[in-house]
A protein has these predicted regions:
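Non-catalytic, conserved peripheral segments adjacent to functional cores
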Residues: 1-76, 91-94, 98-119
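A short, internal acetyl-CoA/4′-phosphopantetheine-binding micro-motif in the GNAT/acyltransferase core
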Residues: 77, 194-206, 364-373, 400-402
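Conserved active-site tyrosine of GNAT-family acetyltransferases
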Residues: 78, 250, 415
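Short, high-confidence coil segments that cap the C-terminus of an alpha-helix
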Residues: 91-93, 159-161, 223-226, 335, ...
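A conserved beta-strand-loop-helix scaffold within acyl/acetyltransferase catalytic domains
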Residues: 122-185, 233-370
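Aromatic (often tryptophan-rich) hydrophobic motifs at membrane interfaces
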Residues: 167, 176-178, 212-215, 334-433
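Conserved acyl-donor/pantetheine-binding loop and adjacent beta-alpha core of acyl/acetyltransferases
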Residues: 180-197
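A gly/proline- and charged-residue-enriched helix-loop-helix capping module
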Residues: 193-240
Length: 433
């Protein structure tokens, strides 16, 4: 304010947290009891009292608050899915509204009872909800046993759980497994899992998923002071029905793709023919009197696995022998060991994580003797064509150089020789706050 009058301004980078698509004004409000009285499904708005003053009521379904606006230098952000009402206008009040979307009549909910019915309620997970959590995993359209508390919590000492559950009209419709790193102020979905995308009920809609993802981001930011949310998506081959609503939500939240690992999966319904070299190896394995069987000989296989991973990839198993035995005892129908034996000795093995849609080889290893007999080739074909022929996919795992985004071309060449083709495991970064 100076002798020339007053000036207020707003810049998209520093003051308005979205690209402004529409601006409108409210004026001549004398005698008007209220304006607004609705919520938007997708549109965000910033409201400013350009002249005069008024009260802004905001209701997010859990908290109702009233803010008095009386300055052109201060605005209030109205997030999507928040109910708003403008009232108690002073004489001569002028209101400016900046919106993130063009006008869309279908984006409005103008009946408060309907609004309450459409709300998604967020509840933080606690151990008392473990039974309900696990029951939802079983019926979710994209659930796997890795989301069960018996799997997620086996290393609870290493991860601070901050998982969330979402309800609509009292019914559980979504869950987000998540862990909190206080030092880095980062939430990860989930720090102890290969993937950790949102679990959805069959009835959950795309709009529901948008609301859940936005609510989760706001909760992580407000409750923990989190600055980042690392989100590891669940590959589509694990979905019992299409479940990529979260990918659209990530796009809307301007999430950044920061990691992509390439796995190789065999389609058991539509086999791509094996390459000639793999066919020769499989033929050789069939002449070597190998026996393929499910086994409980974890203590015999684990030293072989550790030796192979160290010598060929300079790495170690993610699980210790005690951890994998504990998990296999908790999930005997899902975590299985298959071996190839020659003269009674284990010469190759595969630890399989079995889900409804996928048999995933969590670990593969072959001894020097097994290599001579092409035992691992024979074991993979046994899994894909016999043991798991009724599964849509056999996932042979990723082929990345440890700790990098670089492809191990030799390893993926071997897997593709069986007719396996690429499935990606993606990681996104969502900026919070």
């Amino acid at each position: 304010m100076d002798a020339r009058g007053g000036l207020s301004f707003a810049e998209s980078e520093g003051h308005v947290p979205f690209a402004v698509e529409r601006v409108f004004w409210l004026y001549n409000l004398s005698g008007c009891h209220s304006r607004g009285g609705h919520s938007h499904g997708h549109c965000a708005q910033v409201v400013v009292a350009v002249h005069g003053a008024f009260d802004l009521l905001l209701d997010d379904g859990t908290t109702r608050t009233t803010i008095h606006l009386d300055s052109p230098h201060r605005g209030v952000l109205i997030a999507p899915t928040v109910w708003d009402e403008l009232k108690n206008f002073e004489e001569g009040t002028v209101v400016m509204v900046m919106a993130s979307h063009h006008f869309d009549a279908e984006d409005y909910i103008s009946d408060y009872n309907e609004y309450r019915g459409e709300l998604v309620e967020l509840r933080p997970y606690s151990p008392t909800l473990a039974t309900e959590w696990d029951a939802f995993v079983d019926k979710a359209k994209n659930g796997t046993f890795l989301y069960k508390r018996g799997y997620m919590d086996y290393h609870a000492d290493r991860f601070t759980d901050c998982s969330l559950m979402f309800y609509k009209r009292g019914e559980l419709i979504g869950q987000i497994p998540a862990s909190w790193n206080k030092e880095h102020r980062t939430v990860t979905s989930h720090g102890g899992l290969t993937y950790g995308g949102i679990l959805l009920s069959e009835g959950a809609t795309t709009v529901d998923t948008l609301n859940m993802m936005h609510s989760a981001a706001a909760w992580f930011s407000h409750h923990y002071g989190a600055k980042e949310w690392i989100y590891k998506t669940l590959p589509y081959i694990y979905h019992s029905v299409p479940s990529e609503e979260d990918l659209y939500a990530l796009f809307r939240m301007e999430a950044q793709l920061v990691g992509r690992s390439v796995a190789s999966a065999i389609s058991c319904d539509r086999h791509i023919p094996m390459r000639t070299l793999r066919k020769r190896c499989v033929a050789k394995s069939r002449k070597s009197n190998l026996i393929y069987e499910e086994s409980s000989a974890w203590d015999d296989f684990w030293p072989l696995l550790k030796k192979v991973l160290k010598s060929r990839h300079d790495t170690t198993p993610v699980h210790s022998i005690s951890e994998i035995k504990l998990l296999a005892s908790r999930f005997p129908e899902n975590i299985r060991l298959f071996v190839a034996r020659h003269d009674g000795n284990i010469v190759a093995g595969a630890v399989v994580y079995e889900t409804e849609m996928v048999a995933h080889t969590q670990y593969l290893a072959v001894s020097d003797e097994g290599t001579q007999h092409c035992a691992l080739d024979g074991l993979i074909v046994y899994l894909a064509e016999e043991r798991y022929a009724d599964k849509p996919y056999v996932d042979l795992g990723t082929s990345m150089e440890p700790g990098t985004s670089l492809l191990n071309e030799g390893l993926i060449f071997q897997k593709e020789g069986f007719g396996a083709r690429a499935v990606v495991y993606d990681t996104y970064l969502i900026k919070l706050g």
